[in-house]
Swiss-Prot record:
Organism: Gallus gallus (Chicken)
Coiled coil: none
Family (UniProt): Belongs to the BTG family.
InterPro entries listed in its UniProt record: Anti_prolifrtn, BTG, BTG-like_sf
Annotated protein name in UniProt: Protein BTG1
Gene for this chain: BTG1
C-alpha cells in the first residue's frame, strides 16, 4: 500500500473522534440543521486529513503533535473556520457555539482535549497500536503519549491539575 494511503487510512478513527467532539458543540446549540452539521463534519474531516497527511507518525505518536493540535484561544483555529465557512457560518456565530479556549490533540492512537487554560486533560479516544503484540512495545507507546502531555504541563505557571480520564476504546 502506498505510504500516503496507509497514513490517511490510519488516522480515520482519530480524526472522526475529534470532528464528532467539535460537532457536538454545534449540535447542542440547535442553530444548525442536520445537513449543515453533516457538511461541516465531512469538510472538517477532509481538511484535517489533508493537513495531517505528512505529519502523521504512528511509530512516534508525539512527533508532530503540536502541528496536529486544534486550538481555539480567543482566535479560531483556521481549519475549523474553513469548515464553518463552507456552511455559511460566520466566525462570530462560530465563537458563540464553541468554547473560547479549547485545545484538542489529535495524535496516533489518542485524541484528548482541554477546555480552558487550566482545565483537566480528558481522553476522547484511545487505541492500542496495531501490530504491536509485544507488551514492551505497547508500554513504550503509552509512556510516549503520557510524556507528550507532561511536556505541555511542564511549561505551566499555575499548579497542575489532576487528570480526569474519559476513555472510549476503538
Amino acid at each position: 500500500m502506498h505510504p500516503a494511503l496507509y497514513t490517511r487510512a490510519s488516522m480515520i478513527r482519530e480524526i472522526a473522534a475529534a470532528v464528532a467532539f467539535i460537532s457536538k458543540f454545534l449540535r447542542t446549540k440547535g442553530l444548525m440543521n442536520e445537513r449543515q452539521l453533516q457538511t461541516f463534519s465531512q469538510s472538517l474531516q477532509e481538511l484535517l486529513a489533508e493537513h495531517y497527511k505528512h505529519h502523521w507518525f504512528p511509530e512516534k505518536p508525539c512527533k508532530g503533535s503540536g502541528y496536529r493540535c486544534i486550538r481555539i484561544n480567543h482566535k479560531m483555529d483556521p481549519l475549523i473556520g474553513q469548515a464553518a465557512q463552507r456552511i455559511g457560518l460566520s466566525s462570530q456565530e462560530l465563537f458563540q457555539l464553541l468554547p473560547s479556549e479549547l485545545t484538542l490533540w489529535v495524535d496516533p492512537y489518542e485524541v484528548s482535549y482541554r477546555i480552558g487554560e487550566d482545565g483537566s486533560i480528558c481522553v476522547l479516544y484511545e487505541a492500542a497500536p496495531a501490530g504491536g503484540s509485544q507488551n514492551n512495545t505497547n508500554m513504550q507507546m503509552v509512556d510516549s503519549r503520557i510524556s507528550c502531555k507532561e511536556e505541555l504541563l511542564l511549561g505551566r505557571t499555575s499548579p497542575s491539575k489532576s487528570y480526569n480520564m474519559m476513555t472510549v476504546s476503538g
